[in-house]
C-alpha cells in the first residue's frame, strides 16, 4: 500500500534528523555521506533491493534480516545498518529513497553546499557551467553543485531550481506567457 507523499516525507525527515544528529555527535558525517552514496547507488542498480523496500510480501523479520544482510555486505556504518533494520521492523523501508534525499540535503547544508538543478536545451559547455556556478554561488552565498539535465523541449534558455526557488528563462515558458497574454487580449 502506498503512503501519501507528505507522510513519507515526514517519516523520512524524522529518521534523517536522528541519523544526522547521531553522526554529527560521533563526528561521522563523512562516513554517513559515503553510506548515503552507496545506498543510493545500490537502489539505482538493484531491482531486488527496490523490490525489498516496496514489496509488502516480505514480513518484518524477513525484511529486517535481508536489509541487515545488505548493510553488512555493503560494509555500512553500524548506525546506518541498525537504522535500516529498525525501519524494516517498523515497515518503513518504503521511505528509504526519501530518507537518502533528506540526509543528502542535511549533509550538504552542514557543509555549506547547495545543489542547483539546471535544465537546458543543449548541454552546457565547461565555461558556461563555470560562469553559471559562480553566478549562483554569488546569489545564494554557498558552494553550488550543478546537476545538469538536457531537455530539448524548452527550446532555449535555462530552468534553474535551487531548493524551492525556480528561475525559468526558457523560450518555452516565454512563448507560453505570450500565448496566455494573447488569449487575454483576444
From Swiss-Prot:
Taxonomic source organism: Jannaschia sp. (strain CCS1)
Keyword field contains Translocase: no
Official protein name in the record: ATP synthase subunit delta
Gene3D superfamilies: N-terminal domain of the delta subunit of the F1F0-ATP synthase
Role played: F(1)F(0) ATP synthase produces ATP from ADP in the presence of a proton or sodium gradient. F-type ATPases consist of two structural domains, F(1) containing the extramembraneous catalytic core and F(0) containing the membrane proton channel, linked together by a central stalk and a peripheral stalk. During catalysis, ATP synthesis in the catalytic domain of F(1) is coupled via a rotary mechanism of the central stalk subunits to proton translocation. This protein is part of the stalk that links CF(0) to CF(1). It either transmits conformational changes from CF(0) to CF(1) or is implicated in proton conduction.
Subunit: F-type ATPases have 2 components, F(1) - the catalytic core - and F(0) - the membrane proton channel. F(1) has five subunits: alpha(3), beta(3), gamma(1), delta(1), epsilon(1). CF(0) has four main subunits: a(1), b(1), b'(1) and c(10-14). The alpha and beta chains form an alternating ring which encloses part of the gamma chain. F(1) is attached to F(0) by a central stalk formed by the gamma and epsilon chains, while a peripheral stalk is formed by the delta, b and b' chains.
SUPFAM superfamilies: N-terminal domain of the delta subunit of the F1F0-ATP synthase
Xref: InterPro entries: ATP_synth_OSCP/delta_N_sf (IPR026015), ATPase_OSCP/d_CS (IPR020781), ATPase_OSCP/dsu (IPR000711)
GO molecular function, one term: proton-transporting ATP synthase activity, rotational mechanism
Keywords, sorted A to Z: ATP synthesis, Cell inner membrane, Cell membrane, CF(1), Hydrogen ion transport, Ion transport, Membrane, Transport
Family from the record: Belongs to the ATPase delta chain family.
Gene Ontology cellular component list: plasma membrane; proton-transporting ATP synthase complex
Lineage: Bacteria, Pseudomonadati, Pseudomonadota, Alphaproteobacteria, Rhodobacterales
Membrane topology recorded in Swiss-Prot or TrEMBL: Peripheral membrane protein
Compartment list: Cell inner membrane
Pfam families: OSCP
NCBIfam families according to UniProt: ATP_synt_delta, PRK05758.2-2, PRK05758.3-2
Domain of life: Bacteria
